[in-house]
């Protein structure tokens, strides 16, 4: 502990009484007061989650204890720390402290004359002499161990840090002295490390002249300080260093690439393969470091005589926050970062036969003010919805999620400059979601222990005020974005600006962040995906450091300045070498005598920032001139340095840094006065601000930078602190990689720094010249040359015969044009002219590349484009043309209808076919391709028999498993990206900055973002076994993520759920009774509503109560909307809420509601109406009971359909996008994840021997095997159904595996017996795992449940569906529309028999089922659902906060009179339903929604809603 800390710490208690008297406050006992303060929870960093868990505890001493004492020390130290323990004393405060010590008897104990030649140790003799004089104050000092007399200087981190702090304070008047070695006392320069002001080469007149330091001593100092504090340096034998140059020796000695330190958010995960300290391990380390030294020298052009000083983890702050490393050498500062593969360019020639989703960075719905009419795209006034797909190099806009071959618009990311949200004021009004569940619970209680209704409105308001960054207004619903209005963002390219709309600011930020990351990668990295910066020490003009945390919570801080825990921002300005600058501009600057370009970079050091800055300061300061300001500055600008700066960074708007600069600018009084009138006044600087129209971006104004950073702390829109970071509940988990992996990465060839600029980014002069032509001239030329092109010969761009284009210039021009038209890096092979047959034939140019077949219209006003991946082409065959002189060709596309092309000559058609087939042959050369039986045509039966005989022995049979390792890898990568998005959302809420984050793909360690605490997740559902099974699969996936999962459902499934290691809680209801009722009423009708109200009223009341009890202690709630209670429970607990279901439940024009499926399609308006109608009918039936339950048990006000905002709740559809493609009118928070399969037969399952023999005999008899089972359906006449099934099987001459579950429920008489005797063609198997059975059979007949439908489609077998109720009708229609099965409206022996024959022999149905199966096998629904939960978590939390604000305001203006008992309500009466009153205000509510207001509350929290007043 430092001298000054011990002085103030020791004197606090004895002087407290006098200090209190001095300040006029009553005297309190020192010891008791101190202990009381320490035990006060408000003064500790310990906080609790909603479930009562302790996340962090701080047992360290409170180094800021003096701040609790008022009076003298309060005035003395009122601004001692600038940001929660990150600053240091300024000159004035140190002066006061020095004067106080001089006047006291402590002055002789103060360390004197710190310097290179003197020791910092106290003289024990002098202390004993003072004690002998009887000085009681010194005796007190001795007792409290003011100074450790027996301590010795060592390399330990604590002692070294304490010494540094002592000497920094004691030597505040000697800023220029240079320190010696690490084991000796160091001085601290006032301009850099002491008071953290700007350090420039321009020394002020008041700064003391530094002591001249010999050049030889600089090297000694550098060598001594290179070993970072706390690092364990490997001792390298001298024989291993022989023959190495100085740079290599210093790298081997000082580089520790695997060194990682824990911090506030950084957690180090123990490596599974720890490093061994044997000789072999040592040799591997040396070899790795030599490889690193070789690469550093080659890439950064380092000298052999340079000296490596140390490496540090640092984040580059530009348009993104990029994780990387800073390497310090004697002559330069180096920054190096490996971009992740997701954001790095891949070799386009490497074509992978895998799902296209692997190359997708992000996808979703976007609004665009343009419409497609036929083949023409026109700008419109109205907004139209499109499906957008963001890939590594393109943003493609499609008319729907199923039509991905014909983009409406393709934007090349390489030509984009930046993207940003247009209405930024809307972001400032956005609600701040409470991340820390214990500290910022909306209701102030612990959801895990009790109903959180204890807090008052004042407490909630104070919490929300603290989260709203000190805004003067109170948090009401007018201040909070309800996400109802559209949010627009713009994408600025070199030639045009595009504007897109999103449904919420969360979605808009996600689009902007993902696009910004891609733009950063394309413009700021070399072709190897590496970001490089080299700043020569001799060219550094200015540097400074600033702390990141606020000083509001200094008393709660646990960070130790001496332990290098301080997150620091370091800004460096240097003289740049712009290689991209034109020679003409350079000459102009030279003749005008202008100064060189000043570049600047910003780094964030989460750890070891102080250590880095001290080392960096020692490297820079010796080269500072001793002359005055002007001479020093001129000498810098006029000197020609031999060292050259290197950077892959390009100029950009740098919105992230500019936002911080703008916020740190001093606010004038006039501007403050304007701000009081509101936020609609436009700033004059914004009016006259120049628009950026070229990649030559203007750099950040230097004067504004200097004015902004006069303080030693970086001010953010919302002050950050250590506690705020911990409240994010996210950690950067770092795990070390193997040495072998790092060595392999460094063995790969790397480009030199002169090759860092990508050739694909540079524009071609000829291309620019061509683009200057007007659209009219292009159209005239296109029409004029149609005849010539129609009869033109093919063009080949590879050496393959007579059509080869010989001129290099023509080949290069065609290649550039092709890449420009389709925004691809693929290599062009051939081009042709022809027609694409759409609604009408479209004339254009056809391209064949290594990866795609492309088409571009050449007709004026027609913008048709086609990009068809080669991997989707299954067959190319000639066909007849539509006219006599035309020559047709047909492309058979996987999973889609056929595409027809027409050519003007047979030679063009034949050459196209030949080239495409050659590409397909090369593409599939490594595959062991064997046609499926359905692909053999007339030989189908023979091939089917051969296949069955190969796999007839089920004990030895191994079903060919699809290798999904690549798909799982990409799905896990998407989960990692979703965690990053969750952290970005939380960081935005905490700091007010939208910070895109890129994690480095380091060869030394892996970093991933993970929640720092395990969430208690409750899955609430009702229904049959098929309704519960998907939730078990999801629960298993969430448990692997580290969370605690509980399924709340009927008692019947409790034991089954527990076998999977999941928690279980019981809710009311009998699934058998419910299904019996649903089968009786297979559609929505008046009788259904009447009978449901009479039969299930008491059950609904019990369901609501038991559901509320089962969800206690939850942190996240995921519910099937059929359970009815989840949205209200989440509102009461203040926790994020998701819905998950298997059937369409969201308003859309694409699909009707599952309960209103028409016999024939009736269009989008009817589909949308069915959803609105069902929502109102469903709510009308349960609203009375629900509102009574809300008031009496949940302590929530009544609600209505509008206030529930069900359409804004995040929704997860556990259905494959192949079966339920996401509609373009789905909001951003609606996700179609894929099926949640629970593979019960993939483990040690052993089928019954009778079943195995039955299947063997069917194969020998060459009979098809079908499965018939209707799950847990309850029917009236089970015997008649069984007879019809038996007759149909005999009629179709197939073998049947029967699961006769329809007679095993409720009908106790027939439960254990068979109604009729089954023939030998039928085997009654009972329940068999679908994932084991379905791949071994030919067709399946079932009821159309979502799970069973998914299992049959994944197996790729034709499906016959006989629906009974609910979503079964919807899936029967969908399967029939896809052509993969048959829907039975009526089940008889004849209809079922005919369907069995068609399903087992129709090759079109068989083929379509196989194609759907191939798509589903690429999906991983559980992983996609986890990704969606992470990505939408903060959006969901925000919705709950909005509702909580409404509820608190409602209670404030509608208090319950004291002493008045709540009246009892009759449960059989509907008088409690306030829908009639609420419906009267729905029109007003909708108008308020348009104005981005919510539920009738004005800005002052006053209720103006007529529905609220009338209902009470």
Curated annotation (Swiss-Prot):
Residues 22-50, 150-222, 1450-1512 are annotated as: Disordered. Residues 156-169, 1467-1493 have a biased composition (Acidic residues). The keyword Repeat applies. Residues 190-222 have a biased composition (Low complexity). It is a peripheral membrane protein. CDD domains: GT1_Gtf-like (cd03784), PH-GRAM2_AGT26 (cd13216). Residues 296-331, 816-880 form the GRAM domain. InterPro entries: ATG26_PH_GRAM2, EryCIII-like_C, Glycosyltransferase_28, GlycoTrans_28_N, GRAM, PH-like_dom_sf, PH_domain, UDP_glucos_trans. One of its GO terms (cellular component) is cytoplasm. The keyword Lipid metabolism applies. Sterol glycosyltransferase responsible for the glycosylation of ergosterol to form ergosterol-glucoside. Belongs to the glycosyltransferase 28 family. This is Sterol 3-beta-glucosyltransferase. The lineage of its organism: Eukaryota, Fungi, Dikarya, Ascomycota, Saccharomycotina.
């Amino acid at each position: 502990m430092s001298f000054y800390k011990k002085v103030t710490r020791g004197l606090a208690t004895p002087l407290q009484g006098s200090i209190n008297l001095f300040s006029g406050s009553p005297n309190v006992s020192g010891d008791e007061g101190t202990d009381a303060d320490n035990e006060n929870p408000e003064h500790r960093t310990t906080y609790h989650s909603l479930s009562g868990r302790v996340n962090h505890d701080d047992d360290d001493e409170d180094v800021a204890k003096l701040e609790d004492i008022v009076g003298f020390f309060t005035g003395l130290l009122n601004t001692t720390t600038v940001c929660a323990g990150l600053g240091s004393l300024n000159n004035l405060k140190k002066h006061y402290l020095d004067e106080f010590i001089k006047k006291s008897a402590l002055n002789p104990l103060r360390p004197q004359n710190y310097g290179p030649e003197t020791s910092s140790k106290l003289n024990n003799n002098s202390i004993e002499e003072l004690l002998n004089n009887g000085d009681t104050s010194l005796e007190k000092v001795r007792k409290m161990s003011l100074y450790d007399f027996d301590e010795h200087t060592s390399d330990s981190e604590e002692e070294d840090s304490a010494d540094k702090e002592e000497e920094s304070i004691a030597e505040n008047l000697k800023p220029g002295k240079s320190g010696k070695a690490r084991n000796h006392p160091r001085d601290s320069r006032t301009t850099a490390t002491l008071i953290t002001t700007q350090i420039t080469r321009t020394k002020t007149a008041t700064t003391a002249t530094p002591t001249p330091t010999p050049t030889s001593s600089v090297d000694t100092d550098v060598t001594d300080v290179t070993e970072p504090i706390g690092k364990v340096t490997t001792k390298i034998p001298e024989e291993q260093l022989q023959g190495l140059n100085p740079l290599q020796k210093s790298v081997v000695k000082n580089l520790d690439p695997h060194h990682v330190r824990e911090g506030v958010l950084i957690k180090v995960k123990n490596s599974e393969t720890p490093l061994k300290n044997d000789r072999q391990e040592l040799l591997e380390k040396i070899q790795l470091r030599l490889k690193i030294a070789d690469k550093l020298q080659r890439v950064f052009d380092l000298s052999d005589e340079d000296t490596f000083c140390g490496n540090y983890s640092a984040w580059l702050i530009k348009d993104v926050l990029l994780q990387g490393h800073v390497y310090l050498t004697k002559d330069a500062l180096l920054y190096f970062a490996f971009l992740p593969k997701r954001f790095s360019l891949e070799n386009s020639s490497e074509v992978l036969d895998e799902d296209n989703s692997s190359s997708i960075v992000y996808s979703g719905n976007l609004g665009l003010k343009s419409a497609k009419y036929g083949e023409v795209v026109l700008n419109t006034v109205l907004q139209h919805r499109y499906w957008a797909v963001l890939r590594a190099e393109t943003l493609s806009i499609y008319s729907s999620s199923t039509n991905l071959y014909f983009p409406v618009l393709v934007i090349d990311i390489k030509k984009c400059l930046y993207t940003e949200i247009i209405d930024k004021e809307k972001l400032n009004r956005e609600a701040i979601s409470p991340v820390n569940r214990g500290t910022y619970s909306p209701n102030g209680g612990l959801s895990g222990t009790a109903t959180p209704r204890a807090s008052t409105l004042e407490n909630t308001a104070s919490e929300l005020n603290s989260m709203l960054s000190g805004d003067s207004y109170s948090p009401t619903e007018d201040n909070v974005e309800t996400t109802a209005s559209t949010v627009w963002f713009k994408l600025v390219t070199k030639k045009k600006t595009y504007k897109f709309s999103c449904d919420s600011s969360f979605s808009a930020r996600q689009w902007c962040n993902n696009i910004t990351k891609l733009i950063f990668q394309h413009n700021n990295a070399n072709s190897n995906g590496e970001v490089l910066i080299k700043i020569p020490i001799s060219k550094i003009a200015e540097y400074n450091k600033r702390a990141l945390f606020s000083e509001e919570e200094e008393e709660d801080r646990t960070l130790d300045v001496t332990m290098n825990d301080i997150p620091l921002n370091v800004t460096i300005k240097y003289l740049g070498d712009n290689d991209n600058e034109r020679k003409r501009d350079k000459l102009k600057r030279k003749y005008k005598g202008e100064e060189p370009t000043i570049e600047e970079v910003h780094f964030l050091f989460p750890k070891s920032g102080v250590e880095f800055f001290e080392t960096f300061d020692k490297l820079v300061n010796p080269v500072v001139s001793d002359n005055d300001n002007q001479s020093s500055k001129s000498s810098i600008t006029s000197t020609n340095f031999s060292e050259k700066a290197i950077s892959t960074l390009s100029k950009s708007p740098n919105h992230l840094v500019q936002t911080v600069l703008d916020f740190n600018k001093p606010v004038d009084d006039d501007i403050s006065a304007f701000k009081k009138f509101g936020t609609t006044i436009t700033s004059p600087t914004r009016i006259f601000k120049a628009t950026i129209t070229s990649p030559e971006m203007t750099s950040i104004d230097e004067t504004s930078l200097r004015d902004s950073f006069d303080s030693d702390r970086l001010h953010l829109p919302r002050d950050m602190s250590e506690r705020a970071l911990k409240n994010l509940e996210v950690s950067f988990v770092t795990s070390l990689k193997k040495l072998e992996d790092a060595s392999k990465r460094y063995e790969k060839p790397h480009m030199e720094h002169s090759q860092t600029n990508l050739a694909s980014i540079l524009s071609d002069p000829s291309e620019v010249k061509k683009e200057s032509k007007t659209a009219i001239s292009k159209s005239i030329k296109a029409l004029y040359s149609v005849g010539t092109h129609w009869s033109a010969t093919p063009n080949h761009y590879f050496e393959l015969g007579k059509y080869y284009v010989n001129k290099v210039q023509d080949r290069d021009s065609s290649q550039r044009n092709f890449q420009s038209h389709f925004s691809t890096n693929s290599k062009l092979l051939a081009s042709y002219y022809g027609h694409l047959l759409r609604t009408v034939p479209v004339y254009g140019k056809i391209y064949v590349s290594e990866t795609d077949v492309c088409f571009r219209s050449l007709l004026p006003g027609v913008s048709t484009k086609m990009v068809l991946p080669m991997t989707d082409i299954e067959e190319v065959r000639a066909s007849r043309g539509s006219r006599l002189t035309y020559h047709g060709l047909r492309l058979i596309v996987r999973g889609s209808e056929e595409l027809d092309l027409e050519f003007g000559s047979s030679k063009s058609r034949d050459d196209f076919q030949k080239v495409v087939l050659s590409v397909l042959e090369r593409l599939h050369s490594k595959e062991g391709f064997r046609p499926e039986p359905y692909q053999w045509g007339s030989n189908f039966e023979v091939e089917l028999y051969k296949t069955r005989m190969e796999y007839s022995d089920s004990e030895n049979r191994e079903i060919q498993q699809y290798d999904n390792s690549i798909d799982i890898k990409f799905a896990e990568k998407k989960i990692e990206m979703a965690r990053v998005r969750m952290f970005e959302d939380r960081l935005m809420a905490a700091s007010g900055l939208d910070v895109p984050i890129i994690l480095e793909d380091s060869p030394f360690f892996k970093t991933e973002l993970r929640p720092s605490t395990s969430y208690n997740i409750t899955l609430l559902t009702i229904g049959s076994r098929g309704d519960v099974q998907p939730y078990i699969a999801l629960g298993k996936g969430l448990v692997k993520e580290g969370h605690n999962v509980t399924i709340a459902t009927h008692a019947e499934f409790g034991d089954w759920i527990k076998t999977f290691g999941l928690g279980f809680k019981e809710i009311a209801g009998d699934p058998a009774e419910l299904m019996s009722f649903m089968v009786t009423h297979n559609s929505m009708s008046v009788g259904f509503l009447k009978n449901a109200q009479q039969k299930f009223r008491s059950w609904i009341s019990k369901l609501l109560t038991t559901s509320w009890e089962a969800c206690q202690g939850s942190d996240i709630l995921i519910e099937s909307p059929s359970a009815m209670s989840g949205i209200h429970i989440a509102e009461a607990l203040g926790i994020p809420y998701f819905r998950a279901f298997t059937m369409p439940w969201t308003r859309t024009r694409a699909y009707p509601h599952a309960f209103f499926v028409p016999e024939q399609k009736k269009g989008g308006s009817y589909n949308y109406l069915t959803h609105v109608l069902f929502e109102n009918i469903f709510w009308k039936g349960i609203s009375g009971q629900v509102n009574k339950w809300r008031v009496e048990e949940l302590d929530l006000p009544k609600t209505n359909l509008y206030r529930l905002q069900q359409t804004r709740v995040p929704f997860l559809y556990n259905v494959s996008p192949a079966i339920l493609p996401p509609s373009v009118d789905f909001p951003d928070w609606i996700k179609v994840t894929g099926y949640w399969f629970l593979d019960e037969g993939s483990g040690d399952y052993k089928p019954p021997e009778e079943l195995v023999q039955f299947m063997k005999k069917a194969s020998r008899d060459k009979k098809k095997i079908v499965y018939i089972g209707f799950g847990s359906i309850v029917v009236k006449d089970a015997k008649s159904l069984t007879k019809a099934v038996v007759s149909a099987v005999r009629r179709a001459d197939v073998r049947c595996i029967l699961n006769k579950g329809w007679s095993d429920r409720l009908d106790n008489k027939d439960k254990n017996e068979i109604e009729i005797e089954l023939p030998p063609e039928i085997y009654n198997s009972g329940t068999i795992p679908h994932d084991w059975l379905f791949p071994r059979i030919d067709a399946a007949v079932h009821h159309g449940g979502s799970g069973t439908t998914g299992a049959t489609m994944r197996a790729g077998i034709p499906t016959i569906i006989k629906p009974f109720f609910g979503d079964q009708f919807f899936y029967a229609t969908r399967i029939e529309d896809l052509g993969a099965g048959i829907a039975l409206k009526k089940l008889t022996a004849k209809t079922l028999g005919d369907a069995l024959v068609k399903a087992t022999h129709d090759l079109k149905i068989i083929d379509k089922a196989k194609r759907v199966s191939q798509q589903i096998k690429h999906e991983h629904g559980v992983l996609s659902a986890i990704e969606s939960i992470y990505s939408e978590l903060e959006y969901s939390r925000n919705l709950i906060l909005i509702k909580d604000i409404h509820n608190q305001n409602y209670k404030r203006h509608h208090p319950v009179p004291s002493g008045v008992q709540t009246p009892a309500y009759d449960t059989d009466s509907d008088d409690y339903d306030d829908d009639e009153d609420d419906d009267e205000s729905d029109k007003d509510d909708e108008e308020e929604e348009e104005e981005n207001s919510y539920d009738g509350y004005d800005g002052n929290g006053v209720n103006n809603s007529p529905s609220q007043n009338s209902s009470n």
